[in-house]
UniProtKB/Swiss-Prot annotation:
This is Proline-rich protein 32. InterPro entries: DUF4645. Residues 10-48, 101-120 are annotated as: Disordered. It holds the Pfam family DUF4645. PANTHER family: PROLINE-RICH PROTEIN 32.
């Protein structure tokens, strides 16, 4: 009775379905005997064999292959336990000692060690772009391929590279001689003479020029007179009027366009009658000729 309850409850497949699955035929065989296992049995006809063998169970041949090094690869894997097969986390001890020693040296030197590491990286970059041995100076320390020279604690960075090599921005052309000191105030260029800027007395004179031309030649900035021939009747042929036309700026002119004033030429002719000056234009009397005709 208990056997039938187990079958109906779904704990095990029915004997009819088991027979059909084993023989490959889907037709049920009701003629098979119905057997009920005893209570001491493990399950319905299945022996108590584990699904997976234990991990530590190895044959003698496999143990010899693992313990002895192979002739081709020359590797040896110990089989003491699963910990030996597991790869260790992190670098091996020999590799881990090297950064540890480097850290100790840097910690003993302090900021000097950090500067040295930064210098090495910059030195590699500069050496990669330039073929010659570069000279590098960081924080007052000059580094070269030969040795190291330490100086004061300056905050500047000096990289000596030949011109046209590397991606460092090159400076402008350096002028060794004294240069002209020019200042631009309110649109007027003032150029001081070369030499010391501290001058006293009459030497404190500056040439003033407009910024239309070059700063070193202020005379060219002044407008040049342009003679214009007069076509007015009554004037001599030698009479000329001088007007100053400023040069045209190339792109931008800070000054507004100033109009050129010309004096009107004198008019030679009969003078106007004085009667028009005595009376205003709105109260002028009628002419005398018209009054005589009306009378």
């Amino acid at each position: 009775m208990a056997c039938i309850e187990n079958v109906l409850g779904g704990h095990a497949p029915s004997p009819t379905a088991v027979a059909a699955a084993e023989n490959g035929n889907r037709e049920p065989r009701p003629s098979l005997p119905f057997q009920c296992p005893k209570d001491d049995a493990g399950s319905w006809g299945h022996p108590g064999v584990p699904l997976r063998p234990p991990f530590k169970v190895l044959s003698d041949l496999a143990r010899e292959r693992l313990e002895r090094p192979s002739e081709r690869t020359g590797s040896c894997i110990p089989v003491d336990g699963w910990r030996a097969l597991k790869p260790p986390y992190g670098p091996p001890p020999a590799v881990a000692e090297e950064p540890l020693a480097t850290g100790e040296v840097n910690s003993s030197e302090g900021p000097a060690g950090w500067r040295q590491s930064g210098q090495d990286s910059i030195n590699n970059v500069s050496q990669e772009f330039s073929g010659s041995p570069p000279a590098l100076m960081v924080g007052g320390t000059k580094v070269s391929n030969g040795g190291t020279e330490r100086g004061g604690s300056n905050a500047g960075l000096y990289v000596a590279l030949p011109r046209g090599q590397g991606f460092f921005p090159s400076r402008g052309p350096q002028v060794r001689g004294p240069t002209h000191i020019s200042t631009l105030r309110s649109g007027i260029m003032m150029e001081l003479p070369p030499g010391s800027t501290r001058v006293t007395g009459k030497e404190r004179l500056a040439r003033v020029s407009f910024p239309l031309g070059g700063p070193r030649h202020p005379v060219k900035n002044w407008p040049r007179p342009m003679p214009l021939a007069s076509s007015t009747t009554g004037l001599g042929s030698r009479t000329t009027a001088h007007c100053f036309i400023p040069p045209r700026p190339p792109s931008f002119n800070p000054f507004l366009a100033m109009p050129m004033a010309f004096a009107p030429p004198p008019i030679f002719g009969p003078p106007l009658p004085s009667c028009f000056a005595d009376f205003p234009s709105w109260g002028m009397p009628a002419p005398a000729s018209s009054n005589r005709e009306n009378n």
